[in-house]
Amino acid sequence: MASWRCLELARGVGTSILFREAAALGSLKWKRTATAAGASQITNCLHSVASNSKREPRPVKTRVMTQERGSGETQTTADKYEAVIGIETHVQLGTSTKAFCSCPSEYGSEPNANVCPVCMGLPGALPVLNAAVVESGVKLGLALQANIALKSKFDRKQYFYPDLPKGYQISQFDIPIAEKGYIDVDLPVEFGGGHRRFGVTRVHMEEDAGKLIHAGNDRLSGSSSSQVDLNRAGVPLLEVVSEPEMRTGLEAAEYAAELQRMVRYLGISNGNMQEGSMRCDVNISIRPKGREQFGTKVEIKNMNSFSAMQKAIEFEMDRQIALLEEGERIKQETRLWEEGSQQTISMRSKEGLADYRYFPEPDLPEVVLSQEYIDTTRANLPELPDAKRRRYESLGLSMQDTLVLANDSDVAAFFDEVLEKGTEVKQAANWIMGDVAAHLKSIKLTITEAKLTPASLAELIGLIKDGTISGKIAKEILPELIEKGGSAKGAVESKGLSQISDPAVIESMVDKILADNVKQVEAYRGGKTKLQGFFVGQAMKASGGRVNPGLLNKILMAKLNG
């Protein structure tokens, strides 16, 4: 039975809205809805009905299913097939205003606080392109080694949905801002490492739609009502479309993670998946190994982390292989990743290609760029993740250390500044990845939120190197430097923690310890050499851990063996 929906729009909209909800609710009738002029906000709109979303049983783990080969060898079922995976990524840009109007584009505002006639689609309101959107598109295109279009245009992508007030989305169709690029990925060492290059088909500029908020449930199914928040409508996006060149969930997750690092290094987006600043739709099909023809494509949505993406792909690979082994047909559809049950569920059928009836946007001129503009933008690009990893490797760091340090642009910048102070590479890396990272995690701060400066950490490491303090003392001082700031030398002096390095003072200390522990001295000289640690411990206790360990051991051994 058809399900009805109504939508009340506010902000003085004096027109009727004709729409069809395209969610997984079966065949819905068209409904003409009068809008409420002058209402203070967009209000209750969607009455809930039973969802047709199908929860399917978890597939048999096909990767452990085997069959006998003619030679007597066994072959897992999954060895017969390969996945073909492509990703469409929407990157929400961090511009201060929206793509085609002056409304703020900030995340987390009160619903419908950042709206105007343009992003609400009111009659007569005309868009004006935000130049920062074009700049971001060119930066990302150049970072991807793509071809930048000297002349591109915007198009109207037409479809009806409650969160799309204009009835179309301003996007780019046949002439995008950038085409034919690639991303280089270093796979994690724990998964065997290796280098991969994945093609990027295109990058195009577009605007985001609004957002449906489902009361009583975060999904339409089971919600008591739904409301529309248009704060996100008109927020600028860059859509990055990959070539279908990934074959595993790990490769797909690492591709997406590298793209996230790239947009963060460029400073064009925070890439936060939990906030929706980076949304990935995965297209996956299965085919027998050796076959060129693609299988039936299934789209997966609702993955808000890279681990969820990897698990969703692996589940879907198992599900599709199991269907093929049973002789069943794979349906072309959109499926949702459900975190709770750790499986994909059917959302809606996608038989055939959607007809969005693209045509050129008549209210916006072509985007015309000069070669000089492109060259200047290229010259001002920051060092990108892949180049930074290669540089760190050239400094002698392991691939594991390189991946950790270059993963976060802020951590990498901090590390580079510490090195500029003359700190030895491995020492700087060990402190940042070890004690600094551990304390930041315990107090839930990022490296940019902490009071510790690169100069202060470099100074702390220098104090260890010149013998002013021991590593133990440095670790005691570090939390204060992270939480309160200040110089390492100042903290050492104010607490009286300078290392005791005067040979005469250390010799006097050792003489007293040996005099107080005559039996242990005799036992040591009788062959129990492990007692050396006992004497060192006594010296550390007497000095509060401040005695220079190198000098201590030298003087102690001379006294014990003399």
UniProtKB/Swiss-Prot annotation:
| Chief location category | mitochondrion
The record's GO molecular-function terms, alphabetically, read: ATP binding; glutaminyl-tRNA synthase (glutamine-hydrolyzing) activity
By its UniProt entry, which Pfam families does this protein fall under?
GatB_N (PF02934), GatB_Yqey (PF02637)
UniProt entry keywords in alphabetical sequence: ATP-binding, Chloroplast, Ligase, Mitochondrion, Nucleotide-binding, Plastid, Protein biosynthesis
PROSITE patterns given for it?
GATB
Q: What is its EC number?
A: 6.3.5.-
**InterPro entries for the chain:** Asn/Gln-tRNA_amidoTrfase_suB/E, Asn/Gln-tRNA_Trfase_suB/E_cat, Asn/Gln_amidotransferase, Asn/Gln_tRNA_amidoTrase-B-like, GatB, GatB_C_1, GatB_Yqey_C_2, Gln-tRNA_amidoTrfase_suB_CS
Reaction(s) catalysed by this chain's protein: L-glutamyl-tRNA(Gln) + L-glutamine + ATP + H2O = L-glutaminyl-tRNA(Gln) + L-glutamate + ADP + phosphate + H(+)
Task: Spell out the residue ranges making up region: Disordered.
Answer: 48-76
At the top of the EC hierarchy, this enzyme's class is ligase
Q: Where in the cell is it found?
A: Mitochondrion; Plastid, Chloroplast
In the record, biological process GO terms are: glutaminyl-tRNAGln biosynthesis via transamidation; mitochondrial translation
> Single GO cellular component annotation?
glutamyl-tRNA(Gln) amidotransferase complex
Q: Where is the composition biased (Polar residues)?
A: 64-76
Beyond the main fields, what else does the record say? Answer: This protein may be expected to contain an N-terminal transit peptide but none has been predicted.
* Entry function: Allows the formation of correctly charged Gln-tRNA(Gln) through the transamidation of misacylated Glu-tRNA(Gln) in chloroplasts and mitochondria. The reaction takes place in the presence of glutamine and ATP through an activated gamma-phospho-Glu-tRNA(Gln).
Q: Which NCBIfam families match?
A: gatB, PRK05477.1-2, PRK05477.1-4
What binding partners and quaternary form does the record give?
Subunit of the heterotrimeric GatCAB amidotransferase (AdT) complex, composed of A, B and C subunits.
Q: Which family does it belong to?
A: Belongs to the GatB/GatE family. GatB subfamily.
Matching PANTHER family: GLUTAMYL-TRNA GLN AMIDOTRANSFERASE SUBUNIT B MITOCHONDRIAL AND PROKARYOTIC PET112-RELATED, GLUTAMYL-TRNA(GLN) AMIDOTRANSFERASE SUBUNIT B, MITOCHONDRIAL
The protein, known as: Glutamyl-tRNA(Gln) amidotransferase subunit B, chloroplastic/mitochondrial
Q: Which gene encodes it?
A: GATB
